[in-house]
Amino acid sequence: MCTKCGNPEAIHLPAYSRRSFLKFSGVAALGAAVSRSLFAASDEKPKPQNELTPDEALHRLKQGNQRYIHGVMKRHDFAAERAALAGGQNPYAGILSCADSRIAPEYAFDTGRGDLFVARVAGNFTNEDVIASFEYAVQFLGTPLLVVLGHEKCGAVDAAIKTVKDGAKLPGHLPAMMKKITPAVQDVIGQPGDLLANAIRKNVMLNVEHLKNATPVISKFVEEGKVKVVGGVYRLEDGSVEWI
């Protein structure tokens, strides 16, 4: 018999069980809502011209870079795109770029809004946040191409060289950043040619491979031929991109 109501067949859940149930229900509902919203993003195709194969996407970037180099960039009508892009996005390329203020991927490839999915960090290296961002791009936005874009005279790579060769000490969180870049420096020390240029190229190459293999989400798309991961080095003098 229940001591609370006198009903011999009544079963009352303790308060903590009801709270746990409500909490679980709320989490489940939130998870379902998030999943629906993420999958809904993949259904929005505001720019049909961005539905490309990996090779077509790379060719389009190369064409845009040539226009940028020669100063014949397209006129982008942002006003006409606003309504469509307010409802979703389907970028045809994801770019991991250095945070250097002299590098602007949207300009370098002569693209409009909604064309590029850009992540930027000094030294253009991969980490969990960058990888998760590109997982989202390929899984839910259908992005067919990922590019690791380094650039000549990169200050972050130069600092990594100084920490390796000279034992330079850096303040704050900079040492953690250097740990991401020093493997590239160590791999090219002793090689012929300019150390900084070699380290910049190697840093791009290492991060291309890491992006390909660090996560089963991206690697699956790469293995199926639905996504390509490439690297490039941006030239400050003329704006050209050397593809690696």
Residue ranges and their predicted role:
Residues 1-16:
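N-terminal secretory signal peptides
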Residues 15-20, 31-47:
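N-terminal twin-arginine translocation
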Residues 96-98, 120, 147-151, 230-235:
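Short beta-strand segments
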Residues 5, 22-28, 44-88, 114, ...:
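Divalent-metal-activated hydrolytic enzyme cores
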